[in-house]
Amino acid sequence: MRTDIYQSPLCERYASKEMQSIFSNDRKFTTWRELWIALAESEQELGLPISDEQIREMKSQISNIDYEKAKKYESELRHDVMAHVHTYGDACPNAAGIIHLGATSCYVGDNTDIILMQSALIQIKNLLLNAVEALSEFAMEYKGLPTLAYTHFQAAQPTTVGKRACLWMNDLLFDIEQLDFQLNNLKLLGCKGTTGTGASFLELFDGDEKKVELLEQKIAGKIGVSKCQSVSGQTYTRKADFAVLQVLSGIAQSASKFSSDIRLLSHLKEVDEPFEEKQIGSSAMAYKRNPMRSERIASLARYVICDLQNTAITASAQWFERTLDDSANKRLSVPEAFLATDAILNLYINVIRGLKVYPAVIKKHLDAELPFMATENILMYCVKNKGGDRQKLHEAIRKHSVKAAEQVKTYGKDNDLIERIKSDESFGLTESE
């Protein structure tokens, strides 16, 4: 591990090796070469003078990437794609002259971005499904455990611990729906040339538009992404990146809400997230048991939610058929959003699978608020069976509740709300009722 230069915490501390692999240099530049091979094969099939030997040579060198040579070429040429064209050509001297034939940089760059986002979305979906499974098991285990529900983080009415988990799960199911939509609608750029007109390929095929259309279809079939953009400039629309990161932002929102709930429940001592035997909560306060995993979820989620704005601004700032001010931003914003979301979901799964629930504390909190919660049923009963005026009884309950709460909060006394209502003649309740 290098210690003398900056290393991204997303890779060092948070994201899984699987997600890091998707956005690795090996995966990226191998995919470039796969695209160059698909282009050469398709051009050969449509009649261009490309030999089987040239294609075999390209395939044999697909993983033989001399990164030092590519770096040297790029320092001279100031162009990453051409640096790799030359590096690949040096490894395939017989095929060097037909590599990248008719293509522009975005043929490999943009198509690779779509392919990698597709793989990353599949990885994220698998994590979402694992999280939903964990929540489902948790919800079933605690479906019958009553707990105090909160609105405005003030005591409301009873729910169950399992029902509350269904709220978290429902958010993730919504995210899965959004992810599936984007995954099913991801489209390759295809091979449309420098401005999206396919001019270079029309030149190669002597103006045969049918062959140009077939070329794109063949490439898509070989790469395994069935759809291509019907219209583009030099790049695919950057709104596609925004749409994908909207999904990741949505997941981050769901996870952040979950983590906030766990942190609040932890403060109430109703649950604890997993805590290792030798884990330290505070360097100063040895007794502390902080919900640091949930806090980390919230922290990473904030990053992903904010990262969405990068893609929005990038999409809005593109000029005509293309401009390069998207490039540096995309290199950062898209992979890092996936890496952070991957980390968030792995933490989410870890927390819910190891969540410790304390039924005795939950019951204590519920019992303390039961008199207040009973008032809604009392109100309904008295209107229905006693002929009471709903508005007048509601006001009476409000006044009694304020006085009962004052006794609890100011003097530390027991909640006497039910006794106050029972002695109020306007309710007309008997002892047995």
Question: Residue ranges of each PLM-predicted region?
Answer:
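Generic, well-ordered alpha-helical scaffold segments in large soluble proteins
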Residues: A38-S42, T87, A91, A134, ...
